[in-house]
Every structure is written in structure tokens, then in C-alpha cells.
């Protein structure tokens, strides 16, 4: 179920402060965040965020197409190795 329109998009408060500091400093450094649940806002376009996936920080460069999505969508938490092949089929 989608979030109620009257509530507005969810974003952790500290995230806006971090983004503003990064914009004012002018340096293009990775902003480390743990908030995968926060919505990407238009103010974040052009910034690089390091989104934590439980193991490491995945660098995510925010573009205009990402606005409205969640940070967690761009940092997968699970690695898929494929299904194990049948050992009998390999022998033949």
C-alpha cells in the first residue's frame, strides 16, 4: 500500500542537513547514510550518497529520474548467485 498523500514524503531530518552542508561546501564527496527508507528529494540531484546495504556503503549518484523513489531501491541487500546446477547433468 502506498503512503498517504496528506502525510507527504518521508525523509529523515538529518539527511536534509547533510545534503545542505555538502552543497555549500562545493566538494563532491560521498555522504554516508543509513536511512534506506528516506525518499529522494529534488534537492539531492547531483549529490553522491553512500547507502548502507548491511555490509558496505554503495555509492549512489542521484539523478532526476530517481526523485520520489527510496534510497534503498538503489542499494541491493542480497546477492543472487543463481540456482545450483544438477551435478548429474554436469558429468555427462
Swiss-Prot record:
Instruction: Provide the function of this protein.
Output: Protein S19 forms a complex with S13 that binds strongly to the 16S ribosomal RNA.
Query: Into which family does the record put it?
Result: Belongs to the universal ribosomal protein uS19 family.
> Gene3D superfamilies in the record, alphabetically?
30s Ribosomal Protein S19, Chain A
Q: What is the protein's given name?
A: Small ribosomal subunit protein uS19
> InterPro entries, alphabetically?
Ribosomal_uS19 (IPR002222), Ribosomal_uS19_bac-type (IPR005732), Ribosomal_uS19_CS (IPR020934), Ribosomal_uS19_SF (IPR023575)
User: Is Transferase a UniProt keyword of this protein?
Assistant: no
SUPFAM superfamilies hit by this protein: Ribosomal protein S19
Give GO terms for biological process. Answer: ribosomal small subunit assembly; translation
Query: Does rRNA-binding appear among the keywords?
Result: yes
GO MF annotation: an example? rRNA binding
Alphabetized HAMAP family for the sequence: Ribosomal_uS19
Keyword vocabulary terms for this entry: Ribonucleoprotein, Ribosomal protein, RNA-binding, rRNA-binding
- Entry GO terms, CC: cytoplasm; small ribosomal subunit
Amino acid at each position: 500500500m502506498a503512503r498517504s498523500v496528506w502525510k507527504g514524503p518521508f525523509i529523515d531530518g538529518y539527511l536534509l542537513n547533510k545534503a545542505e552542508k555538502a552543497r555549500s561546501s562545493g566538494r563532491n564527496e560521498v555522504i554516508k547514510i543509513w536511512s534506506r527508507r528516506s525518499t529522494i528529494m529534488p534537492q539531492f540531484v547531483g549529490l553522491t550518497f553512500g547507502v548502507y546495504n548491511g555490509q558496505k556503503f554503495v555509492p549512489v549518484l542521484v539523478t532526476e529520474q530517481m526523485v520520489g523513489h527510496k534510497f534503498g531501491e538503489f542499494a541491493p541487500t542480497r546477492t543472487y548467485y543463481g540456482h545450483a546446477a544438477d551435478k548429474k547433468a554436469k558429468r555427462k
